[in-house]
């Protein structure tokens, strides 16, 4: 007796639904990998769980973005709006421009120049000479600025030295003034006790 046909409908029990999703998901990914290897097919798989988690698989020979682009071209269905297409074109343009600049930089460094013709080599030579002129000009600006700064520092040093000398002279002058005042004060103190004796001697002479 054969198995009865299982009705396909939403599993109400949350735990059973999670278990079934995990099993069926793993089975789908396994089948996608098998058909990729067995049939040399380009396979992509994207699954979104009920909780929003994404599970994806893409064959090793092509990334998912390239596969979606191929799908869009072959099916005629637009997966991206005009804004995204313009953005994609801008990215491609910037990438090509970057590759061109990288190649030009290698040429300026003397690399990969075997394929250049005479006209291109002359253009590279002109670019190098122009770059050298700009480097020399900037180098001269730095040297002039350095000398100017050194001159300013020397002038500041001279002014500081002069101010220091003036301060030292003022301190020395103040010290000499204090020493002279101290000396005068000591002399007046010694003479003071002698003055009464002189007055007594003068008085005795007057009386005699």
Curated annotation (Swiss-Prot):
Keywords annotated in UniProt: Activator, Coiled coil, Developmental protein, Differentiation, DNA-binding, Flowering, Nucleus, Transcription, Transcription regulation
GO term, biological process aspect, one: cell differentiation
Domain K-box: residue ranges: 84-170
Subcellular location: Nucleus
GO CC list: cytoplasm; nucleus
Pfam families the UniProt entry points to: K-box (PF01486), SRF-TF (PF00319)
Effect of residue 203 to T: In strain: cv. Cvi-0
Resulting phenotype, residue 89 to D: In strain: cv. Gr-3
Coiled-coil boundaries: 75-117
Consequence recorded when altering residue 142 to V: In strain: cv. Kent
Protein's recorded name: Floral homeotic protein PISTILLATA
Database matches in Gene3D superfamilies: Transcription factor, MADS-box
Organism encoding this protein: Arabidopsis thaliana
GO MF entry, a single one: RNA polymerase II transcription regulatory region sequence-specific DNA binding
């Amino acid at each position: 007796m054969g198995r009865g046909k299982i009705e396909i409908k939403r599993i109400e029990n949350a735990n059973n639904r999670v278990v079934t999703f995990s099993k069926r998901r793993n089975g789908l990914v396994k089948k996608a990998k098998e058909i990729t290897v067995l049939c040399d097919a380009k396979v992509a798989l994207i699954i979104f769980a009920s909780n929003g988690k994404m599970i994806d698989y893409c064959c090793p020979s092509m990334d998912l973005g390239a596969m979606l682009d191929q799908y869009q071209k072959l099916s005629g269905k637009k997966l991206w709006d005009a804004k995204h297409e313009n953005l994609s074109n801008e990215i491609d343009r910037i990438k090509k421009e970057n590759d061109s600049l990288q190649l030009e930089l290698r040429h300026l460094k003397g690399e990969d120049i075997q394929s250049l013709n005479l006209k291109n080599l002359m253009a590279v030579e002109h670019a190098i000479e122009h770059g050298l002129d700009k480097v020399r000009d900037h180098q001269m600006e730095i040297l002039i600025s350095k000398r100017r700064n050194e001159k300013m520092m020397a002038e500041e040093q001279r002014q500081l030295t002069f101010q220091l000398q003036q301060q030292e002279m003022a301190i020395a002058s103040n010290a000499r003034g204090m020493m002279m005042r101290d000396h005068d004060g000591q002399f007046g103190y010694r003479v003071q006790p002698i003055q009464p004796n002189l007055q007594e001697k003068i008085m005795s002479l007057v009386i005699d």
